[in-house]
């Protein structure tokens, strides 16, 4: 006859874990954005969290903006985060582009007044198809404006302008002089240091 195996006691790892509240940075009004379990607070550091702008502001029209945060320190049962970037949803970007229009992408790394580097990706959509020379000039104007604006703003001020859409509005008003634009959005940002 076969021998019965000795039963091993299974340890429930969930009982060892504690729940930590995740909060946004001070420039995003120190709001609570979720909870996460961890056995040790050190395991939380570096963990990424993604939240829509609607969840933070309550404004449903900002549903398409996703903000990315990373936990950088833990104090008690509160995990504090830092902003690492944002992006817009692909379905929103696709809805802006139609046949007979031009999609102009401009990407640049800008440096803020307090020596922080941020990569910004701007999307401009024209009302009709633009010539390649017009598109090239528009990219140049957009990149110059981004660099100029970032140089005179602190990191927190720049992020607020990017997320609220005020920088995109400023780009729109300057770039529409070259060719009529339908829409301008900063579709992605990434903090480099």
Swiss-Prot record:
InterPro entries: Ribosomal_eS1, Ribosomal_eS1_arc. GO terms for biological process: translation. It holds the Pfam family Ribosomal_S3Ae. Keywords: Ribonucleoprotein, Ribosomal protein. GO terms for molecular function: structural constituent of ribosome. GO terms for cellular component: ribonucleoprotein complex; ribosome. Belongs to the eukaryotic ribosomal protein eS1 family. This is Small ribosomal subunit protein eS1. It comes from Methanobrevibacter smithii (strain ATCC 35061 / DSM 861 / OCM 144 / PS).
């Amino acid at each position: 006859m076969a021998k019965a195996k000795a039963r091993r006691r299974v340890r429930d790892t969930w009982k060892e874990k504690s729940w930590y509240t995740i909060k946004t940075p001070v420039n995003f009004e120190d709001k609570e954005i979720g909870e996460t379990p961890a056995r040790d607070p050190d395991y939380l550091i570096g963990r990424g969290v993604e939240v829509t702008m609607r969840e933070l502001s309550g404004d449903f029209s900002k549903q398409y903006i996703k903000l990315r945060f990373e936990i950088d320190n833990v104090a008690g049962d509160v995990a504090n985060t830092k902003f690492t970037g944002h992006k817009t949803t692909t379905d929103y970007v696709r809805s802006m582009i139609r046949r007979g229009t031009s999609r102009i992408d401009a990407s640049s790394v800008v440096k803020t007044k307090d020596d922080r580097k941020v990569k910004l990706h701007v999307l401009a959509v024209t009302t009709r198809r633009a010539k390649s020379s017009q598109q090239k000039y528009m990219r140049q104007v957009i990149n110059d404006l981004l660099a100029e604006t970032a140089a005179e703003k602190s990191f927190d001020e720049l992020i607020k302008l990017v997320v609220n859409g005020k920088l995109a509005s400023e780009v729109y008003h300057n770039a529409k002089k070259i060719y009529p634009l339908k829409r301008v959005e900063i579709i992605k940002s990434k903090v480099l240091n």
